[in-house]
């Protein structure tokens, strides 16, 4: 089995967001398969971290330095994409047909040099492909869920008082548009 360096802005024990929870499930699955996973916050990544690790997963990387992004481009890394970090606002929905003008695309070389860019759905992958024009984009076909969270969802679905209802999760993250969902 291999050693894996897992880079993300935050982890689930720091911020319980959707991307962070997905990362945690992935890390657990890797542990169960015998891999050693070392988690490092993106703003704490050092040159030696990149030098000493052959297999790297980069998740949310807003806080990753430009120098580290450049150095990673000569390494064996994949991007586990939770949103659209090739756009300054990370929301392709503000563009016609979800297609941003070329001058709005950022981090393209970082995506291009990745062995793969793993997107959470076919819709997500199609939008990323349309904007980045890359062949290394892959759809995972959905999110990763822990058994605990799947159990909670199953229980909610069994409750007749909760049928035919919906929920909006509060988020202060601008591109998630919580206010728009409420209105």
Language-model segments: which ranges?
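Short beta-strand->alpha-helix junction loop in the catalytic core
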Residues: 139-155
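A short, active-site helix/loop in glycosyltransferases that binds the activated sugar's phosphate group
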Residues: 112-137, 144-146
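Membrane-proximal helix-turn-helix segments that form the acceptor-binding/catalytic region
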Residues: 96-117, 126
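Conserved catalytic-core segment of nucleotide-activated headgroup transferases in glycan assembly
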Residues: 152-183
């Amino acid at each position: 089995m291999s050693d894996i360096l897992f880079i993300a802005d935050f982890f689930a024990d720091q911020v319980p967001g959707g991307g962070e929870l997905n990362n945690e499930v992935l890390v657990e699955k890797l542990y169960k398969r015998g891999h050693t996973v070392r988690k490092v916050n993106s703003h704490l990544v050092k040159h030696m971290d990149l030098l000493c690790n052959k297999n790297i997963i980069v998740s949310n990387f807003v806080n990753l330095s430009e120098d580290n992004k450049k150095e990673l481009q000569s390494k064996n890394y994949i991007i586990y994409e939770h949103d659209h970090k090739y756009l300054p606002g990370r929301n392709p929905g503000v563009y016609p047909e979800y297609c941003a003008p070329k001058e709005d695309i950022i981090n393209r070389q970082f995506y291009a040099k990745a062995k793969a860019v793993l997107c959470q759905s076919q819709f997500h992958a199609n939008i990323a492909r349309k904007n980045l024009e890359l062949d290394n984009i892959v759809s995972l076909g959905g999110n990763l869920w822990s058994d605990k969270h799947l159990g909670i969802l199953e229980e909610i679905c069994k409750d007749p008082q909760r049928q035919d209802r919906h929920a909006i999760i509060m988020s202060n993250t601008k591109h998630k548009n919580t206010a728009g969902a409420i209105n």
